Amino acid sequence: AEGSFDVQIQILEAGAASGIPVSGTAGAAGISGGDTTYVMPPERAVAALTRDILNRIPRRISDKDGHPGDMVNFVIVGSEERLKRAFENGGWVLVDRTKADAVVHTLISTLSKEEYVEMPMSELYLFGRPQDFGFAHADPYAVVATRHHLRVWKSASEVGGETLWVGAATHDVGFEKDQRNGSVTHKIDPDIDLEREYLARTLVASGVVTQWAHVTPENALTGAKTATGGSFHSDGRILVLVVGEGSSSGATSK
């Protein structure tokens, strides 16, 4: 899938902050409890992320047969090491890559009486290849049916000398029929912007994100169907995150 972006950076006034209610737990990010509000720092434009760079980013990912799927709804600027640290600090886990890995991990988890959150996710494609990494954030007891998850691809572009990673995040909320073959597949929350903002608050609270903002593409995608036939809708904005050295301890709640 192809697309072009006419970028508008949405920035809060200097010194402003927005309170975002958070439910559940975000691991080392320091967010816990259903009534906790983490105060997000203000959005700040990423000047090095030019329109030309954004124009080279496909609008959607696809399945192996080229059927368009989930919307690209976030990009991350930074090294692989810092990207992984941000996810780890934010309470996300790197999922297993293969079924063989899953069998071994499940056995170990069973023997140690631990829950298995890192189950593999299906391979979807961007830049002509499956995802480089998959991350999940879930209640282990409900992970079979519901899971926050995302896929990340390393792009060929750099922003200010740093790697540009491109991703798609969705929230599995149950099961539905795969319209391609009649099998059972995960159903995603059709309001995919909720998952984009869930990603924003868990990673910004990780202590590794140094800048964040939203960009609005020209002719923004506001609704479509996934490769399996499920529908989704969006305000069309894309989350931009820059990961730096940051703090290993994460942010605090108020």
Feature roles, as predicted:
Residues 2-3, 66-68, 127-129, 144:
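Solvent-exposed loop and beta-edge segments used for protein-protein assembly and interaction
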Residues 3-58:
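Charged, low-complexity intrinsically disordered tails and linkers
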Residues 3-7, 70-72, 90, 148:
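Envelope-exposed proteins and targeting segments
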Residues 10-14, 86-93, 152-155, 202, ...:
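Structured segments of extracytoplasmic/periplasmic soluble domains
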Residues 50-66, 105-117:
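Accessory recognition modules or surfaces
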Residues 56-86:
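Terminal, regulation- and interaction-focused segments at domain boundaries
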Residues 79-95, 101-102:
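Primarily extracytoplasmic ectodomains and periplasmic/lumenal surface modules that are beta-strand-rich
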Residues 98-253:
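A cross-kingdom signal targeting lumenal/periplasmic-facing segments of multi-pass membrane
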